[in-house]
């Protein structure tokens, strides 16, 4: 080895190995949720918590206590709340009686976040859902309705509105949901399609216009022609969402469905852990480490370089960053780096930024040039959540990964 490498190896060898498990972030602060039906078996719920999830998904009333005992949260799913023909609701007294029964059965269980209503509804169904969620809010204040939206690229006919903005805003204005939730699966052929960033850009804008936080439901299994999960696919989906100011991550799906070519969810069709489970845990623990800082930040801009997806903005418009260089070692020929920068400020007006490597296959060494001279970067550690001086070998990004900085 060369002398400089020997010195670095010696310095690393001299450091004691320290392991830190970040404090768990509550689901009401930043949900990390398995999308789908929650299990009844305590051992499966225990595995969910060990994987870094804080919400088990959609549980039956009878399982809510098991979810609580496992240290998780959930949305209750019950046909007395969500089993209606939304084009022909029964009389209101009948709905009120049904909802009251479910609310009484749930009681004061702190694990229950609210009630699952429907996934990807047509806009014509939302007014009826709004009538039911209005009764829910009256009888169970503080409980949230849960509806997840289509991705923006579906047709107007499937959404039932002339544009995606109108569709998404109905979730807030008609159903009264206190968060936006949507999905957009775009991992194909070793790349993230631009649809993913298009949707983030649109939802971030609507989130700011309606003053409503947003949750992203990301791909966590392989099916159809989507890629198989990896550290890189989880990193890019999660860190891009964080860079856009997202306030929740959901995984479709934690359990591998028993049909088609679905495979490599965190738990397979026989109830066993797959390699995906470990990758999921690794990224979830990073979310727990960063969430206490992220939830205090307000998103002020997101910028892409060198390619700028539709609806998105170029790095030249950044207020904080003049430029970024991304380099590779020993790679011939070197690959052009692709990245995005999310910018934020905290309650004291202090600036933050997050850089995300958009490449799913390559690591890069990076250097950030700030617009204001004399400023320096303080790294928020992805593993402890603590601030630390930016130096040593911190200037490398793994495929899909991101780093949060405070600008001092």
Where are these regions (language model features)?
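Glycan-processing catalytic domains of CAZymes
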Residues: 15-375, 380-408
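Hydrophobic h-region of N-terminal signal peptides that target proteins for export
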Residues: 5-15
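Positively charged n-region of N-terminal signal peptides that target proteins for export
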Residues: 1-3
């Amino acid at each position: 080895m060369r002398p400089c490498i020997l010195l670095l190896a010696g310095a690393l060898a001299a450091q004691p190995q320290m392991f830190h498990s970040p404090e768990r972030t509550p689901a009401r602060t930043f949900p990390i949720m398995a999308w789908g039906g929650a299990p009844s078996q305590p051992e499966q719920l225990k595995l969910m918590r060990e994987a870094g999830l804080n919400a088990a998904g959609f549980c039956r009333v009878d399982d809510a206590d098991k979810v609580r005992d496992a240290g998780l949260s959930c949305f209750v799913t019950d046909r007395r709340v969500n089993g209606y023909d939304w084009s022909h609701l029964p009389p209101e007294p009948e709905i009120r009686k049904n909802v009251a029964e479910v609310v009484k059965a749930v009681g004061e269980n702190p694990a229950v976040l609210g009630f699952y209503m429907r996934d990807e509804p047509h806009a014509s169904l939302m007014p009826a859902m709004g009538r039911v969620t209005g009764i829910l809010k009256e009888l169970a204040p503080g409980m949230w309705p849960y509806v997840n939206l289509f991705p923006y690229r579906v047709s107007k006919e499937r959404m039932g509105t002339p544009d995606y903005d109108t569709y998404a805003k109905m979730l807030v204005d008609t159903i009264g949901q206190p968060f936006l939730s949507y999905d957009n699966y775009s991992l194909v052929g070793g790349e993230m399609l631009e649809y993913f960033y298009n949707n983030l850009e649109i939802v971030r804008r609507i989130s700011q216009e309606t003053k409503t936080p947003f949750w992203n439901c990301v791909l966590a299994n392989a099916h159809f022609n989507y890629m198989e999960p990896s550290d890189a696919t989880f990193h890019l989906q999660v860190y891009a969402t964080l860079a856009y100011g997202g306030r929740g991550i959901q995984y479709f799906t934690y359990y591998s469905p028993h049909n088609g070519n679905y495979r490599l969810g965190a738990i397979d069709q026989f109830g066993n852990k797959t390699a995906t489970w470990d990758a999921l845990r690794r990224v979830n623990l990073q979310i727990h480490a960063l969430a206490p800082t992220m939830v205090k930040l307000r998103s002020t801009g997101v910028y892409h370089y060198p390619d700028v997806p539709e609806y998105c903005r170029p790095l030249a418009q950044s207020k904080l960053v003049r430029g970024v260089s991304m380099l590779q070692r020993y790679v011939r020929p070197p690959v052009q780096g692709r990245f995005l920068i999310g910018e934020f400020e905290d309650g004291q007006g202090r600036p933050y930024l997050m850089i995300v490597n958009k490449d799913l296959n390559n690591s890069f060494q990076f250097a950030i040039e700030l617009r204001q001279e004399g400023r320096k970067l303080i790294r928020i550690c992805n593993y402890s959540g603590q601030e630390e001086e930016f130096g040593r070998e911190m200037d490398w990004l793994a495929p899909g990964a991101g780093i949060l900085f405070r600008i001092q």
